[in-house]
């Protein structure tokens, strides 16, 4: 999973353009006193004929509200250096520039905490963090200052940054592995949409007791929550459980156990 997340395939999520060229970013004061806005120019090379609104909505995941804001923003949409309307056409080879503004209030509800943060990949839109076992991703009952999200806010506080931090998916407390975080509202919306569309895959490594006579296999057993369990635990439940599918592959066989790669 780490190799997948850190590969070039995820850096710009294959946006339907040749590449999302390195965006320029700078901070400036917003129109309201005391508020700071981050302005970024995002540049895309167009691969196929389409129109601007379709590209923004389908390829980049912009909402109606975000597209409407671009219409009235000075130089919000430029094609080959000239300002364009959202209804205009795009031709193969065009260079599309989008001026994005986001209020820099950050995830103010998160309390910054000390901790060692292992960053596997980071750019202006997202980051991939190696989560250790024994720590929650988000604050929840009884854990409001000792989660991975709290440690990340401490990490950014030291750098003088206040990102809008959103995790795309999560891992259970006792599970270690790579966790994907969005750093802006725009990237959070885009990544969440791609997750719903099934464009991300998770792979787990598990140590299982016993000898496996086959190199791969499938497990199809309904699972349900153990009543009253806290934290939540799951168990096989053929009557009330939800359908669950696990695909496993033998990575290495040991004398009394085996290392398996799991795809859920």
Positions of predicted regions on the chain:
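Charged/polar low-complexity intrinsically disordered segments
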Residues: 18-19, 32
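RNA pseudouridine synthases
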Residues: 25-264
